[in-house]
């Protein structure tokens, strides 16, 4: 089971947006408690991203850049 910290690190290490990211403490992760953590919503630099699990891999999609 992924912890919040390991999940945030995974997001940081795999995201393809700006690599000059904030420290881990400034990355806000919210897990939607669906079955087996299928959906993960997090914000980075005023952007909202949705992580969806797809065949045991997480892919990320930009939802909003407001």
UniProtKB/Swiss-Prot annotation:
This is Host translation inhibitor E66L. Its main location: host cell. It is found in: Host endoplasmic reticulum. Keywords: Eukaryotic host gene expression shutoff by virus, Eukaryotic host translation shutoff by virus, G0/G1 host cell cycle checkpoint dysregulation by virus, Host endoplasmic reticulum, Host gene expression shutoff by virus, Host-virus interaction, Modulation of host cell cycle by virus. Belongs to the asfivirus E66L family. It comes from the Viruses. One of its GO terms (biological process) is symbiont-mediated suppression of host gene expression. Inhibits host protein translation, probably through the EIF2AK2/EIF2S1 signaling pathway. Promotes cell retention in the G0/G1 phase. Residues 13-34 are annotated as: Involved in the inhibition of host protein synthesis. GO terms for cellular component: host cell endoplasmic reticulum.
């Amino acid at each position: 089971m992924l912890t919040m910290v390991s999940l945030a690190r995974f997001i940081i290490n795999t995201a393809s947006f700006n690599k000059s990211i904030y420290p881990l403490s400034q990355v806000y992760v919210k897990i939607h408690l669906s079955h087996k953590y299928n959906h993960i919503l997090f914000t980075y630099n005023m952007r909202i991203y949705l992580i969806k699990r797809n065949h045991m891999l997480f892919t990320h999609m930009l939802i909003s850049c407001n």
